[in-house]
Amino acid sequence: MATAASNHYSLLTSSASIVHAEPPGGMQQGAGGYREAQSLQVQGDYGALQSNGHPLSHAHWITALSHGGSGGGGGGGGGGGGGGGGGGDGSPWSTSPLGQPDIKPSVVVQQGGRGDELHGPGALQQQHQQQQQQQQQQQQQQQQQQQQQQQRPPHLVHHAANNHPGPGAWRSAAAAAHLPPSMGASNGGLLYSQPSFTVNGMLGAGGQPAGLHHHGLRDAHDEPHHADHHPHPHSHPHQQPPPPPPPQGPPGHPGAHHDPHSDEDTPTSDDLEQFAKQFKQRRIKLGFTQADVGLALGTLYGNVFSQTTICRFEALQLSFKNMCKLKPLLNKWLEEADSSSGSPTSIDKIASQGRKRKKRTSIEVSVKGALESHFLKCPKPSAQEITSLADSLQLEKEVVRVWFCNRRQKEKRMTPPGGTLPGAEDVYGGSRDTPPHHGVQTPVQ
């Protein structure tokens, strides 16, 4: 058995380059380095599959074999026949290292020794018994796990592997490679569903390891999983079908939807243009202003419209919707105005009660010169001065007051911030006429 163990070590060294050659005294570093080298080699090479379709290379196969007989082989390294007996019980063709704990070799190194001296045959027997008990427990656990995996559906095995990854997940992947073909077929995606098959430890979307599913396996697993089962704890509720559309019947059916304005009542753009043209002509012929029409509509029908709205309606500047709303009201107003064109009616009374705006006051040239001369003397006269000036010029007091207000505003616009312009007296002489846009106007009452 010692020879077999040494051959086993030579195979590992030649095929996978896992164990480095050490001098005779190199055993003092402990057996943990040997185990760690194996683990690092297997974990690093798991990301690449062989060309023949098998997930394990030759080095991985030999490494998996080393887990089965490493307990006895390590003990028989330098102890002779006693250590060889320990290696015979742990067969190198073990079923699988699934869930196998990290067991260090049973070599006890003395301080300052060569590393091949043991404490005695009693310690070897005790260690051998412990190893046998541990192997029996591992075999029982493996059988239970295999039975549970056979009973589970494939998609549940896939989710269990992704939701509970552990430190020995890469070993479970190696165990899946040793499964017989019948078990691999019954378990579906067990081989490729382990979380250890990742690229340099990268995780897929959602924080779960990205499995290397084949396209056929992925489709076969995803379809029944999404169609029938959803074992995630935060599963989405089943989407309810959309509510049925409201019943639609013929136009006369009570369940049908009726538009307040049917297609027959909705005017076209040509109709609106023709009506606006006729309305404007009739309004001017009857002698009503746009403001009178807006006020009459507010008094008669409760909808107050401004002069601007009526103007925009006649110019076709409103939206189509607003034009359609305003057309029937204006049509009723036209009918009312045409029927009462010969006698004073409520429309005339409403128009007479509308906003009264005083006409523009025109001042004679001589009167304007007198106001200009008084303005140069006193730009802001008092109320008594305005009254006396209005009496002397035979003007209304309000007209004189408004003229002085407009004149002061004109002076502000024409005078720069530095002071008065030179020759202002000549500019504002009596022979000059005030521009028409600065004439006397009375305020709106």
From Swiss-Prot:
Protein's cellular compartments: Nucleus
Disulphide bond pairs: none
CDD domains: homeodomain
Top-rank taxon, per record: Eukaryota
A GO CC annotation given for this chain: transcription regulator complex
Tissues with expression: Expressed specifically at high levels in the brain.
Protein name, entry field: POU domain, class 3, transcription factor 2
Lineage: Eukaryota, Metazoa, Chordata, Craniata, Vertebrata
Gene coding for it: Pou3f2
